Amino acid sequence: MSNYPKRIYVLPARHVAAPQPQRMAPKRALPTEQVVAQLLGDDMGPSGPRKRERLNHLSQEEKMDRRKLKNRVAAQNARDKKKERSAKIEDVMRDLVEENRRLRAENERLRRQNKNLMNQQNESVMYMEENNENLMNSNDACIYQNVVYEEEVVGEVAPVVVVGGEDRRAFESAAFINEPQQWEQARSTSINNNISNQLRRMDSKKNNTISVDMYLTIISILCNHMDRNKKMDTSNKSSNISRAQAESSIDSLLATLRKEQTVMQRLVQADPCTHLQKRVKHFRRIP
């Protein structure tokens, strides 16, 4: 144990830079002879020096006959190799022509596909632009359809409703018109029908304990309806009245309505049923 050091120091490892990737040199094109040899299957490996036999035991004539035989065999082998090579070349040429035809057909197909895709892309862009224009036009049309053009009527006053003894009045805008609107006539007929139905129900039930607010509401609606018809007639006859005169007429109308309302409230509190029936008969007699 005494051989071991008493202290052990742990030091940080040195910073080792990452090895830079080596740039690969571009591959050189193979020479034509090597390409042809690969296609034909020739052996391009290195060949050693040819060893010659010692012919010391043969005579000169035997050497000549042997040489002639070897030349004849070599010529025949060369002819056979030439035929075999020519056959291989024909096969390779046939395969290359077929591959060239296939590549040309594939290239033409890819050209047509690329052209179709470009046309579809242009058509999609044009279609999107047309859709955006149509959408904008439809939005504009919807906006203009939602716009409502209203004509203001001179002296048109909202009905006065009494709830719990407090007045809640709403005043509508006033303007000049030349002739009465159809919806005003329909509204007047509907109001008369509603009032007659309410009175029939009241007569059938014979209920004398009806709230004062209901009487005052009905009276206010009737007064407003009659005054509106009068104002419509006067506005048709004199369409050139100024706005100041119209405002003064509205103020006077409001004052008369308030006075009439107070009077009606007193009368209704005294005897509700009889006074309301007289008032309704009076309005029915008026054309």
Swiss-Prot record:
Function: Required for transcriptional regulation of the unfolded protein response (UPR) in the endoplasmic reticulum (ER) under stressed conditions, acting downstream of ire-1, and also maintaining ER homeostasis via a negative feedback loop, in parallel with ER kinase pek-1. May also regulate Golgi protein trafficking distal to the ER. Protects the host organism from the detrimental effects of mounting an innate immune response to microbes, such as the Gram-negative bacterium P.aeruginosa, probably by modulating the UPR.
Gene Ontology biological process: defense response to Gram-negative bacterium; determination of adult lifespan; endoplasmic reticulum unfolded protein response; ERAD pathway; IRE1-mediated unfolded protein response; lipid homeostasis; negative regulation of multicellular organismal process; positive regulation of transcription by RNA polymerase II
UniProt feature, compositional bias: Basic and acidic residues: 78-87
Protein name: X-box-binding protein 1
Signal sequence extent: none
GO cellular component: nucleus
Residues covered by region (Disordered): 63-87
UniProt entry keywords in alphabetical sequence: DNA-binding, Nucleus, Transcription, Transcription regulation, Ubl conjugation
Region of interest (Leucine-zipper), ranges: 89-117
Organism: Caenorhabditis elegans
Top-rank lineage group of the source organism: Eukaryota
A matching Pfam family: bZIP_2
Region (Basic motif): 63-88
GO molecular function, a single term: DNA-binding transcription factor activity, RNA polymerase II-specific
Subcellular location(s) per record: Nucleus
Residue stretches making up the bZIP domain: 61-117
Disruption phenotype annotation: RNAi-mediated knockdown inhibits induction of expression of the endoplasmic reticulum chaperone BiP homolog hsp-4 and heat shock protein hsp-3 during the unfolded protein response (UPR). Larval development is normal, but in a pek-1 genetic background, causes arrested development at or prior to the L2 larval stage. Abolishes crt-1 promoter activity. Reduces lifespan, perhaps acting independently of macroautophagy. In combination with RNAi-mediated knockdown of atf-6, causes lethality early in larval development.
